[in-house]
Amino acid sequence: SHETEIGDRMVAMMKPDIGLYMRKPWKGLPLLRDALAMPPKKVRKGKGQRVRLPNDLTKLPIPKTWPMDGGHFVTLPLVVTKDSDGEHNLGMYRAQVHNETELGLHWQIHKHGAEHAAKGERMPVAVCIGGPPELIFSAISPLPDNLSEYQFAGILGQKSLPITKALTQDLWVPAEADIIIEGYCDPTETKLEGPF
């Protein structure tokens, strides 16, 4: 099945035979070829952009998993941001609905958002829900700086990943996401997360 093939490729890529590539560098060429041949494909409109809903996060199917949890948390949120050089990042961070218009993201302070926080500027953000499994795996994988999560997802799925321009933010988002929540992160606004 397609899913089994993707899983097999994931395992092979996470445990490459470095010794083999050192002895026989040409054996690594297929992986390099795949990386170069899989840039994301820009498309006009994404699946998650067909219907625009009013600014009310409480209307979305975001569960509260346990009775004592501090709120509703997005399951497998694909968080899209970009740095000052325009390089996009796709990660997975806990996302808690605080009210109709605020979604709290649990950042690691030393990571991607630190640059925006140091400058005291808002960071454009898109939180995407749904999409192909290779995209979800790509978001949580430790990748080298010169390989984007979108490229890696393309390699895993053996086809260029379609991306589309976000409607309200200067970001490219996965075109196959079911739901796209667009907004910004203000480094001067913080809230306590949870309880869990």
Which sequence ranges carry the predicted segments?
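Extended, highly charged
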Residues: 1-196
